[in-house]
Amino acid sequence: MAEAKALPRFKKLYQDNIRKALLEEFKYDNEMQIPRITKVVLNMGVGEATGDSKKPAVAAEDLAMIAGQKAVVTRARNSIATFKLREGMPIGAKVTLRQDRMYEFLDRLITIALPRVRDFRGLNPKSFDGRGNYAMGIKEHIVFPEINYDKVDQIWGMDIIVCTTAKTDDEARSLLRAFNFPFRQ
């Protein structure tokens, strides 16, 4: 008999508490109108990739360790002579997380990684795009426990985009605040 998979902590929190709280706060007519997180995109741009084409592959390995799923090496869309960049050159890595892996990553991000960021004063509450999506940047990828600090040859920053079904920024802010995102006051 197959064992039942454990439900991620944040997914259970959303299903049990957050949905009800958002339904009461915004008075939705239909349960499908309640905002939810659809995906989390992690992007790591490697600026020095023009000199060394192996760096995006190393960044992709680190990103795969952080995300728990294989990262895709991103390539330049067009050539830029001033940056010595040619079309098709590898310039970074990205990974898209959905479902259980997304909730597990958000749990690790909020409870472990963000408190380890140096001089962390909270997330910028204005980083919403107007359609309910939130973007943030981390200057050092070594704040994640999956990365062994001794084996890292270079420290990279990364972008984290949280995509939601919220129609407005206020709905998205309430959703993420319910997930204990530490927004600056």
UniProtKB/Swiss-Prot annotation:
The name this protein goes by in its record:
Large ribosomal subunit protein uL5
Record's keyword terms, sorted: Ribonucleoprotein, Ribosomal protein, RNA-binding, rRNA-binding, tRNA-binding
**Which SUPFAM superfamilies is this protein grouped with?**
RL5-like (SSF55282)
Q: Which GO terms describe its molecular function?
A: rRNA binding; structural constituent of ribosome; tRNA binding
CC per GO annotation: ribonucleoprotein complex; ribosome
**Which organism is the protein's source?**
Brucella canis (strain ATCC 23365 / NCTC 10854 / RM-666)
Q: Which family does it belong to?
A: Belongs to the universal ribosomal protein uL5 family.
* Cited function: This is one of the proteins that bind and probably mediate the attachment of the 5S RNA into the large ribosomal subunit, where it forms part of the central protuberance. In the 70S ribosome it contacts protein S13 of the 30S subunit (bridge B1b), connecting the 2 subunits; this bridge is implicated in subunit movement. Contacts the P site tRNA; the 5S rRNA and some of its associated proteins might help stabilize positioning of ribosome-bound tRNAs.
Q: Which GO terms describe its biological process?
A: translation
Q: Which PROSITE patterns match?
A: RIBOSOMAL_L5
Q: Assembly and interactions?
A: Part of the 50S ribosomal subunit; part of the 5S rRNA/L5/L18/L25 subcomplex. Contacts the 5S rRNA and the P site tRNA. Forms a bridge to the 30S subunit in the 70S ribosome.
HAMAP family this protein is in? Ribosomal_uL5_B (MF_01333_B)
Q: Which InterPro entries match?
A: Ribosomal_uL5, Ribosomal_uL5_bac-type, Ribosomal_uL5_C, Ribosomal_uL5_CS, Ribosomal_uL5_dom_sf, Ribosomal_uL5_N
